[in-house]
Amino acid sequence: MKRISVDIGGTFTDCFFVWDDRYVEAKALTTHHNLALGFNEALDLACKRADLDRVTVLSEVDSVRYATTLGTNALIEHKGPKVGAIVTHGFEDAIPLSRGRGYGEGLDYSMQQNLPAAERPDPIVPRAMIRSVKERINSAGKVVARLDPDDVRSVVRELVNAGAEALVVSLVNATENPEHELAIQEIFLDEFPPHELGAIPLLLGHQVSGRKGEYVRATSTIIDGFLHETMFHALSQLSQNLRDFGYDKPMLVIHNSGGMAQMNSTDALQTIHSGPIAGVGAAEHLSSETGVGHVISTDMGGTSFDIGLVPEGGVKHYDFLPTIDRWLVSVPMVHLDTLGAGGGSIASYDRIHNSIKIGP
């Protein structure tokens, strides 16, 4: 058995590979401008320890598995493109209002007990970047009000002219009938063809999440759109780098559900927490091998600290409506708690509020 596993975090890139009966690990600094460079450095160090070379390893290895917290860190630090959202007319404020729970979502229990002192998180999509189109599909999937193509063109142009670098579409009841979301996509591609310079991605809510619930589907699509380019470029760099050195198999990406898939079968949203969740899977295996009943899995990087549980020798806790950072989404994942503080966090004194702040 020959496998390579790589975990790229905000600070370090860790490489671990199994080569028949040998187990080798190595670490290098993450190179954010080109993630492949840090990966190559870690892999070369591991190869040196095993008396192998990179080309031999990549041409003979059975699989390369990739996990990361890059998406998690980008969301926590709000590093991403300017996103515009298109929703059904009359639902423009559904996202900012966040079902009336935005003040408490993602906070611990003690902080939720004092909601008057809580603050809403900074929006990924500000209200000024939300536009609506006149259309309506009922809960049975029947078209009640037809979509106006001219209205769509006007809205799309407004968002692009306002500086949108990614667009998301989340219409009411689109999971029952995606006709209008698909029509918006067709109009958008006609207005802004993907082969032209400056082309921007457009994501559809019913494709990102096929579950009911307008708000959680919208937030899921927004986060996916916010992270799409970041994760696409990161994964593409790594995939091309592997091919350049003789790896001719698909690169596998760890999902936050605990499974894995090829890059072209992975949404950006599915990569959030994939690094520490892969660690939870390893803790489950360790529990099984050693007979230890309960295991706590922790993953402290330079940017975040993640905690997972393996009670009674198995992963039993899944979130079907998890909160990622401060946002409720509808993508099922292994339960994990994340703190926005790690080995590289900086403490500072806020003179105005007379408080200590720690974080990225």
Predicted regions mapped to residue ranges:
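N-terminally biased helix-coil "hinge/interface" segments that flank
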Residues: 1-360
